[in-house]
A protein has these predicted regions:
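Beta-propeller domains with acidic blade repeats across secreted/periplasmic ectodomains
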Residues: 1-177
Length: 177
């Protein structure tokens, strides 16, 4: 049987958790100003099986529920993937697999949400980053999402995700594979 144990650290609002590289990685989205949004690493520094050290590897500006989300292990087990929604500002990155000349690329004139929801959110929107285990090098893996919360790799190492989109939005998405 499994048991649940409270981790004795002062971190809130973890939307994603991953155990890798002898550490617990957290994708944290700040809802209440207690814990900064970003990628965290929790480790056991004295060998007592208790996570006692909290490191904010990268602070990421995010707001609302479309912020920093899941953390996934790469198929080769050498890096992390951080999933972020469209209320997350792009963080500094060292490289990109996709073009970074962000644009709206709408086929028809822009039609912002009539109710005012996220009218100011433009491309690149949500981004999937590939990140080294120390959180120093961020590479844009894919971007253009609205509110992706998680992703998964298949047996061939292909990444799949689902975008929680505004079902009544008639514009084309920002997707960039």
């Amino acid at each position: 049987p499994s048991s649940i144990e409270r981790v004795p650290v002062d971190v809130e609002a973890a939307n994603g958790m991953l155990w890798a590289f002898d550490a617990l990685y957290l994708g944290v989205n700040n809802y209440n100003d207690h814990t900064k949004s970003g990628l965290y690493r929790l480790t056991d520094t004295i060998g007592d099986d208790q996570l006692d050290k909290v490191e904010l590897l990268r602070q990421i500006s995010a707001r609302g529920d479309h912020g920093v989300h899941a953390v996934r292990l790469s198929p080769d087990g050498k890096s992390l993937f951080l999933i972020t929604g469209n209320n997350t500002e792009p963080t500094e990155f060292s490289d990109s697999r996709v073009n970074t000349n962000w644009g709206e690329d709408h086929l028809l004139p822009r039609m912002p949400d009539g109710r005012g929801h996220n009218r100011d959110r433009l491309a690149p929107a949500g981004i999937i980053y590939q990140v080294d285990p120390d959180g120093q090098n961020f590479e844009v893996y894919s971007h253009g999402y609205r509110n992706i919360f998680d992703a998964a790799f298949n047996a061939d190492g292909e990444l799949f995700t689902y975008d929680a989109d505004m079902e009544y939005d008639f514009n084309t998405p920002w997707y960039r594979p």
